[in-house]
Amino acid sequence: MSIRQQAVIPAEPAQVYGVLADADALSALSGMSGRPGRVEGEEFSAFNGNVTGRQVEMVPDARVVQAWRFPRWEAGVYSIVHFTLTAVDGGTRLVIEQHGEPQDWHDHIDANFPTFYLGTLVEHFSANAAG
């Protein structure tokens, strides 16, 4: 199974990357605890430990690839999440692609990317631009 979603975030790619690449920054936006993984190979957690994984690839201002799992998944089951950033008029196009999530989790994850990532980032950077 695969998921693909996108949005234009009203911020520069470096600003968006700064949130995606650091669970501390993501925690500040979501209000949920996390443990940062700031370099390739490092483990991270986000959303009060509901997502854990490892940073697979980190290309500043362009891409973050993570191996993800939820604690309720069978042991050893991970999916791969790609966050791709492209500068566009009005900010940064953020494309999120997730591959390999368990079929019974597809709808849950697909429904929550806007809540936990896309919508949150748009709201945060829109508020910063206005204020």
PLM feature segments, named:
Residues 5-7, 34-35, 42, 53-54, ...:
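Residue-level detector of beta-strand structural context in well-folded domains
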Residues 16-17, 26, 44, 55, ...:
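Hydrophobic pocket/interface hotspot
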Residues 100-131:
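A conserved amphipathic terminal alpha-helix motif
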Residues 45, 49-93, 99-101, 130:
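Hydrophobic-ligand binding "helix-grip"
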Residues 1-35:
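Hydrophobic ligand-binding cavity/cleft-lining segments
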Residues 27-33, 40-41, 46-48, 69-70:
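A short gly/proline-enriched turn/hairpin at secondary-structure junctions
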Residues 25-28, 39, 115, 130-131:
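Structured surface interface patches that mediate subunit assembly and partner/cofactor docking
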Residues 20, 30, 59, 68, ...:
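Short, flexible helix/strand-to-coil boundary loops that buttress conserved ligand/catalytic motifs
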